[in-house]
Amino acid sequence: MTQRFGKVGVLYGGRSAEREVSLMSGAGVHEALRSAGVDAHLFDTGLQDLTALEAAGFERVFIALHGRFGEDGAIQGALELLNIPYTGSGVTASALAMDKIMTKRVWLQHGLPTPAFEEIDSDTELRRVPDRLGLPLILKPPHEGSTVGITKVAACADMEQAYAAASHFDEVVLAEQFVRGRELTVALLGSGRNARALPVIEIVAPDGNYDYQNKYFTDVTQYFCPADLPVGVAEQIEKIAVQAYRALGCEGWGRADFILDGQNQPWLLEMNTSPGMTSHSLVPMAARAVGMSYAELCVAILADASCKLRAPARANG
């Protein structure tokens, strides 16, 4: 079965702030694919030029890149030009999901629940933002993941420092209403009508601090899969996750992050189109809950690889 994939490149590393995580994800995916009999080879896009992909004879690639130049549509566009099938979402969906502000706008247009927010920049009167969104609130760069540059602001006096941390990555920053509740995530597989949600995972971090360190480098965070939720609530969250995925045009696989408030109302936070695939990562955990091994998951994602753009038909004459 795996022989039909031909020579496969596992794109990892890259140049984003999430390079370290991507190196771990790529190494895991590479090992899993090799164990399944796939002719897989690592390719660090931060060290090698993409034109080398074509020269190396890769017939498809597994994108294990995170953040800028990996899940923002840039690498996807290059692969379309090279006509090399790739995993995950296409150019447009990747770019949309990478921009948390645009993502929230799309979700609101589709009637999906997401916390109130504002765009802020260097001209914004920062101390007035809490008047509209309340305290605490969240400041985050809209084009980063893995909690990079995120600050929970507890007082007006902290706004400038929090903005400085986020604006180090993006000039325009997302200010978001803080919703107190349970942190949940839903992995998704497939595309279009075939998109499906895997069981909901609950994340319980020390003092509620699910930061970069606790995500990837400690064992103090607890995960519950499936999450201990009333059946109706779990089904509602999975349904919203699929709707959010489809609204953005996502394909292949992804992960939707939620907060569940005290009234069991789920709130969408963001969509990841190239989620982590490390030993601590959540998509492999959800797959295990439905009897899918890590290697089987990687092969299933790879099997869905494709070029998404279609060349227009040539006019006669």
UniProtKB/Swiss-Prot annotation:
Pathway: Cell wall biogenesis; peptidoglycan biosynthesis. It catalyses: 2 D-alanine + ATP = D-alanyl-D-alanine + ADP + phosphate + H(+). It is an enzyme of class 6 (ligase). Keywords: ATP-binding, Cell shape, Cell wall biogenesis/degradation, Cytoplasm, Ligase, Magnesium, Manganese, Metal-binding, Nucleotide-binding, Peptidoglycan synthesis. GO terms for cellular component: cytosol. Residues 104-303 form the ATP-grasp domain. InterPro entries: ATP-grasp, ATP_grasp_subdomain_1, D-Ala_lig_Van_CS, D_ala_D_ala, Dala_Dala_lig_C, Dala_Dala_lig_N, PreATP-grasp_dom_sf. ATP binds at residues 130-185. Mg(2+) 1 binds at residues 257, 270. It is found in: Cytoplasm. Pfam families: Dala_Dala_lig_C, Dala_Dala_lig_N. Binds 2 magnesium or manganese ions per subunit. One of its GO terms (biological process) is regulation of cell shape. GO terms for molecular function: ATP binding; D-alanine-D-alanine ligase activity; metal ion binding. NCBIfam families: D_ala_D_alaTIGR, PRK01372.1. Belongs to the D-alanine--D-alanine ligase family. This is D-alanine--D-alanine ligase. It comes from Bordetella avium (strain 197N).
